[in-house]
Amino acid sequence: GLIDLDYTIKKNVSNLADFKNTNPSELTACLLDRPRHKKIIDELKELKVNIVLISDGDVSGALLVSKPEYKVDIFLGIGGGPEGVLAASALDCYDCHFQGRFIFDKDKDIKEARDMGITDMEKKYELSEIIKGDSIFCATAITDCLPTKSNDKDVNALNKIVKDKNNIFLTETLITCLLYTSDA
C-alpha cells in the first residue's frame, strides 16, 4: 500500500510525495493539536511537511483530504473510535484510503471490545472492513474547524459554522452517499 499504519512517518510521506510527483515540502498534513501527537509533528517538521493543527473536529479534519480545494494531503494521528468510523463512512464516498487500529488505555476497554466480538486487539482495519455496505454520512458544522496553527494559511474550512441572520439560523450540511446496487 501507498500509506500504511505500520510504516514510519518518513516512509508514508515519501510514498505520498512520490505518488503525487512532488517534494515532501509541498505536502500538507493535518492533525489534532494534542500532546500525544508531538512525536508525529516533530517528524513532519523534520521532513519539512506543511502542518495544519486543528483544536477539535477530527471527522472534519479527516474529510479535508477528500478534495483538492481543501489543500490537505494526509490526516493522521490518534483519535476516537466512533469518530474513526464516521470519518471512514464519509471518506468511503470519496474513494479515499483509511486505516484504523484500536488503542486501549484500560483493561475495561479491552473487556468491552471483547464483549463486542473483537478478538484481535492489535488488528489494523482497512476502510472496507469498517464500512461493509452502503454508506451515508451527514455533517452540520456547529463550531469552526479552522486550524489553530498552520504554516499553510490557505487551508480552507470544510463547512461554515452556524450563522445568525436576524434570529434566523443558517447552517451548512455536508452529505455523502455511496449506495451499492446489484444486478440480481
Predicted segment positions?
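Acidic beta-strand-loop-alpha-helix segment within the catalytic core
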Residues: 1-53, 174
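Short acidic, glycine/serine/threonine-rich loops at helix termini
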Residues: 40-44, 64-67, 86-91, 148-152
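Conserved small/polar residues in nucleotide/adenosyl-binding loops
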Residues: 180-184
